[in-house]
Amino acid sequence: YGTPKGYHLMDGNSVHAYKMVNAKGQYVYVKFHWASVQGEHNLSAAEASALQAQDFNHATRALMQEIERGRYPQWDLYVQVLRPEQLNSFDFNPLDPTKIWTGVPERKLGTMTLNRNPANVFQETEQAAFAPSNLVPGIEASEDRLLQGRVFSYADTQMHRVGVNALQLPVNRPRNEVVSNNQDGAMNAGQRSGSVNYEPSRQVSVKDDAQFKSSALPLAGSTQQAAITKTLNFR
């Protein structure tokens, strides 16, 4: 059955493949997986129907109650890694977000612990603006076509919902100070002088950090509309 008993009793997945890039611009493809330390526990159809008739917010409530009681839920983070030359060794496209990388070893990266509930739901939850375009140096979007669309559409949606300066809000703001030529716009809380709001520019000293190199993928061929050849549907 597919209805989680609570959010603390379910796993999480990146769905899409991403790239991890080193200082030389070399990259590998990765998928991330959050494994619930509490284990997975789902409701039957009858249980889900009865419970959700009384409390449609049961999964959120169960998670918050666990935290309130001091039983802090945990998830282990795992990563699967494929080298670029391995992509064509499968009978499906590993960049297809509907596919699981069965047989590819998982490596544990760490553990996430939720040790408190939001002190202010609006400030810490409703204002949160998640988007797959919010990537730190060293992680890039793969060529997954669905992900490429989401990189634009999610950021655009959050810009419409929260505003062009959503990344200035404490819940979205990076830990390290952002130095860029972005300025102004509705609800701007930053302090800027000057009028240069683009990059590159010879009028200001702000430049891209050369130590963070993007990966390069050589391409050759023709654009076309064609059926997907390696589908492996329903497996």
What are these regions (language model features)?
Residues Y1-R235:
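Active-site-adjacent core segments of small-molecule enzymes
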